[in-house]
Structures are given as C-alpha cells and as structure tokens.
C-alpha cells in the first residue's frame, strides 16, 4: 500500500498559528504528536519584542547573529533547519516552505534578499540549511548568521526559518506518516521604508467554468492586513464568480494568480463585468474589466472600465463655480457704481 504523507506546518506570523495539512490551510492552536517545540530568540535588531517572529532593522554590509531554540520531546529526533523566501500563495496565505525555484514562480522580481545563499545555519559552511540530531528531552540553541549585502538599503524582504522533524523509523513503517514543521517569519528591513499602497489588479486565466485574478506587487513593500474582493456579474447584476479574503499579507514583489469561487458557468455570447478591489486601512484600489464570451466559449478581456464620475458631485461643483462667478460680478458691479457716484 502506498504511504500517505501529511505535512503539518506551524506558521508563526502576526498572532495566529496556521497548520498546513495535505496542502490545505487550517487554523489551529497546537500540533499534537509533534514531539518538539521551537522558538526564535530575539536580539537587539528586533523592532518589536512582543512578536513571536523576527522583524529586524539592519544596515547594508552588516552581519547579524541570531539563535533559534529547539526543545526535543521524549525520543531521539532528527531535524532539518532551512531558510526560505516567503511568498503569498494562491490561497492568499504566507508560505515559508518553498525552495528557490518554486518560490520564484510567485514573485515579479528575483532581485531580492537571497534567503537561500545569505543565511547560514549552525556550523554548516553551506548556506540555507542544516541537519541536527537531538537526544530525548535535549534542548539546543542553533546559531543563524545573516549576511546583509553592502548594496542592500531602503529595502524590505520576508523569509522564514523552518524546523522540520523527520519521521522516525517506527513512523515510516506506518501507512500514515506525519511530518511536522515549525516556520517563523524572518523580516529584514533597511533604511527608509515606502508606506504607499500600490498593487496591480488584473484578470488572470479566464474560462467559462473557472476564472482567476492576478495580483502583482512591483515594489519592496510589505502590504499587511489587506482585504481582497473580486466578483464577476452579468449586466443584470447576477453573481457568477467571487473571491473574498478579509485579511492577508502581500509580500514584496509578489506575483500570484488567485482562483475565484465559481457559482455559475459563463454563457457563450454574453458580457460580464469583473470587479477587483483591494483595501488596506483607509486606502482602496479598484479595477473593473469588461469580459466577453464568444460563440466558441472563449473569454476575452475587452477593456478596463474607468470608474464613472459622480454626476451629482459634478453638478455641485458647477453650482459652486456659478455662485463664485456671480458673486464676483456683483462685487465688481457694486464697486464701479460707487466710483460713478463720486
């Protein structure tokens, strides 16, 4: 019988714990059976000591020394510790587990801080990874060295330090193998930070029975607590597909396609409106596109619709302008009349 492997990943980012089980994201409070725990040890570069992850203020050319503590459980275990680039995945969730080639598929630029080559773990001379063995009930602090390039300034990048426990020989003999992994965010910022809210919202892959939107962040800006919504409606306002994320994080230089939840299949020869809106605090970005389905069922994006101007607001402005002109005319007329009497 083919063994089924399930990966449980703890993503310590902001205040929640995200467990990835069979590729699905589930909120949880523990990982029963993991047989270990891990925690980042914060130091002087930390911008906020109340967080459970690293957010460091660094300088170009600087070398940072961190530590992560691993507390082993009741049996001897082998751990793989890795450093990876963080990405926003198609579920609008931060993923710290991807290797370099896979992570770059979700980025609009690869000219970022290199978490695979500039981070050294333990005494390993090879960057990006380290394997250790801990005896039962053993605790150990593992050093992490980060080399900041001299040219790296006014930037921000986000990666993650992953601690994965390998399956024991006993677990390997079972039909269901659980692999447990804890991942902690590692955010590096240097110099002045851009606080603007600027992401590209466009149509992704469009078919009659499945659609997606494309989100791109071309800047070195970490967009936290971003609300994302999208709908496809016909001319009568009937909803065909939608997407609604109440909050998510967009990593710097993100490039992701997010699938919509299809309620009805698009019909041949019909027109639809795709509306995409991203909101962060009091800032909102919105794009609207006209979709046309031809007689062969091919969906085409014909144009980006410009938001209609508020006509009532325009009338108010015209009215105020007319009053201003009229008032100025009265003042000039009165002034001339008084001069004539003199």
Where is each model-derived feature located?
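Membrane-proximal extracellular "stem/stalk" segments
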Residues: 189-313
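Sec-dependent signal peptide cleavage junction
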Residues: 20-33
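Bacterial N-terminal signal peptides
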Residues: 10-21
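C-terminal membrane-anchoring or membrane-association module
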Residues: 319-342
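Short proline/glycine- and polar residue-rich coil/turn motifs
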Residues: 58-60, 131-140, 247-256, 283
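Terminal connector regions
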Residues: 77-106, 141, 147-189, 268-302
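Surface-exposed binding patches on compact interaction domains or structured appendages
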Residues: 32-40, 76-141, 226-243
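Beta-sheet-dominated interaction scaffolds and their linkers
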Residues: 39-73, 77, 85, 131, ...
């Amino acid at each position: 019988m083919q063994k089924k492997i399930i990966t449980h990943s703890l993503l310590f980012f902001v205040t929640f714990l995200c467990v990835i089980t069979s590729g699905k994201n589930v909120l949880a409070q523990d990982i029963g059976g993991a047989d270990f725990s891990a925690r980042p040890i914060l130091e002087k570069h930390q911008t906020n000591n109340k967080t459970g992850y690293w957010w460091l203020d660094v300088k170009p050319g600087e070398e940072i020394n961190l530590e992560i503590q691993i507390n082993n459980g009741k049996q001897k275990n082998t751990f793989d510790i890795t450093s990876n680039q963080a990405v926003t995945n198609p579920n609008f969730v931060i993923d710290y587990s991807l290797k370099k080639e896979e992570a770059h598929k979700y980025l609009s630029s690869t000219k970022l801080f290199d978490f695979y080559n500039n981070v050294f773990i333990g005494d390993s001379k090879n960057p990006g990874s380290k394997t250790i063995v801990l005896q039962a009930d053993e605790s150990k602090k593992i050093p992490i060295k980060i080399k900041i390039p001299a040219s790296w300034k006014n930037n921000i990048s986000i990666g993650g330090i992953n601690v994965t426990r390998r399956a024991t020989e006993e677990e390997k003999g079972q039909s269901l193998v659980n692999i447990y992994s804890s991942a902690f965010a590692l955010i590096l910022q240097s110099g002045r930070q851009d606080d603007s809210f600027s992401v590209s919202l466009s149509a992704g892959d469009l078919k009659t029975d499945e659609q997606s939107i494309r989100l791109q962040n071309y800047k070195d800006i970490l967009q936290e607590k971003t609300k994302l919504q999208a709908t496809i409606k016909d001319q009568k306002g009937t909803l065909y597909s939608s997407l609604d994320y109440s909050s998510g994080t967009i990593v710097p230089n993100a490039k992701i396609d997010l699938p919509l939840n299809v309620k009805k299949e698009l019909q041949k020869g019909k027109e639809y409106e795709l509306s995409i809106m991203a909101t962060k605090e009091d800032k909102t970005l919105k794009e609207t596109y006209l979709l046309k389905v031809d007689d062969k069922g091919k969906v085409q994006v014909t144009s980006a619709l410009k938001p209609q101007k508020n006509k009532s607001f325009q009338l108010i402005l015209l009215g105020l302008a007319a009053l201003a002109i009229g008032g100025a005319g009265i003042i000039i007329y009165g002034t001339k009349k008084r001069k004539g009497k003199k």
